[in-house]
Amino acid sequence: MTATVKDELSRLRVAKPCCRRAEMAALLRFGGGLHIVGGRIVVEAELDTGATARRLRREVAEVFGFPSTVAVLAAGGLRRSVRYIVRVERDGEQLARSTGLLDQRGRPVRGLPPQVVTGSACDAAAAWRGAFLAHGSLTEPGRSCSLEVTSPGPEAALALVGAARRLGVQAKSRDVRGVDRVVIRDGDAIGALLTRIGAHDSLLAWEERRMRREVRATANRLANFDDANLRRSARAAVAAGARVQAAMRILGDDAPEHLLAAGRLRIEHAQASLEELGALADPPLTKDAVAGRIRRLLALADKRANALGIPNTEASVSPDLLENA
């Protein structure tokens, strides 16, 4: 889903100047950094999509009036995908000051610029949009779904957490193997953030996949529940059949005929339900009547077995018998 969201955000048109500035400030902060080349400050951003690189170059030119260059690094070695390096060299220091990467005294800002941190909700949304375009990812919906942004440092991560809070979204900053990440795991919170940053089509696709996954999970739970019920029913039928056979051996013909008839039905139709056995009886019986007759047959046989000192009907139900049911 990451590529889908970034493609949509790269095509999003933003009208308010403050939002465009906030987005570029976050994109440059999370996607790149400042370098000294030949005694001059160079602003550089490394991005993973051509669409994001084009958006950055266009906004830098339209909002700040500075030209930029782009270099394409092919995949290979440690790089698993193509990377796009956008540089502003000649006007790097001016851009860094304009976007808040440098403070008024020319020192690097470790978090996000004050105008973004203390700005309005639209500035917070723009900052998240820029941060996601720079180093964000969105996993498929599921039990472990997450929206993450890799941060250049803890200060920037905490600033992004604060921006999410201003949008009514709970995000957490985590240090994962020495890398600072801002993470949102709640599905509803992810949906709310996608809405606020303008990824509406991506949200619809994500929610559709989320719904399909939930439906499949529910269907699987119901299927497992049904399977468990069937196994329990099968084992109960096998156990009942074994006990009835033992009862018939213990009693022989020395039992009321209506009880013996119910026992024979149970043996002849081992997998049938009590309701089905009742329908097979002549005359037909209710399932409660069938259950009662079989219960009395077993009780009569167990009483006879105890009097004779022989194993009762329950002794015929072995673990191996149930395991093979």
Swiss-Prot record:
Family listed: Belongs to the WhiA family.
Purpose of the protein: Involved in cell division and chromosome segregation.
Any GO molecular function: DNA binding
Keywords for the protein's UniProt record, in alphabetical order: Cell cycle, Cell division, DNA-binding
DNA-binding region(s), residue ranges: 273-306
Source organism of this protein record: Frankia casuarinae (strain DSM 45818 / CECT 9043 / HFP020203 / CcI3)
UniProt name for this protein: Probable cell division protein WhiA
Membrane spanning stretches: none
Keyword Cell cycle: yes
Gene3D superfamilies for this protein: Homing endonucleases
Gene Ontology biological-process annotations: cell division; regulation of sporulation
Family annotation (HAMAP family): HTH_type_WhiA
Matching InterPro entries: Homing_endonucl, Sporu_reg_WhiA_N_dom, Sporulation_regulator_WhiA, Sporulation_regulator_WhiA_C, WhiA_LAGLIDADG_dom
